[in-house]
Curated annotation (Swiss-Prot):
Belongs to the bacterial ribosomal protein bL34 family. One of its GO terms (molecular function) is structural constituent of ribosome. Keywords: Ribonucleoprotein, Ribosomal protein. PROSITE patterns: RIBOSOMAL_L34. GO terms for biological process: translation. Residues 1-44 are annotated as: Disordered. It comes from Nostoc punctiforme (strain ATCC 29133 / PCC 73102). This is Large ribosomal subunit protein bL34. GO terms for cellular component: ribonucleoprotein complex; ribosome. Gene3D superfamilies: 1.10.287.3980. PANTHER family: LARGE RIBOSOMAL SUBUNIT PROTEIN BL34M (PTHR14503:SF4), MITOCHONDRIAL RIBOSOMAL PROTEIN 34 FAMILY MEMBER (PTHR14503).
Amino acid sequence: MKRTLGGTSRKRKRTSGFRARMRTPDGRNVIRARRKKGRHRLSV
């Protein structure tokens, strides 16, 4: 039997992708914080 916990890339990108983050001021803060911290991946 297959599990239902697959994870859909479209949903993931839409909610926590780079462009989704840039859309809101708080999302921009997230990107800014991750840049400052030196994260290799800024978003999903």
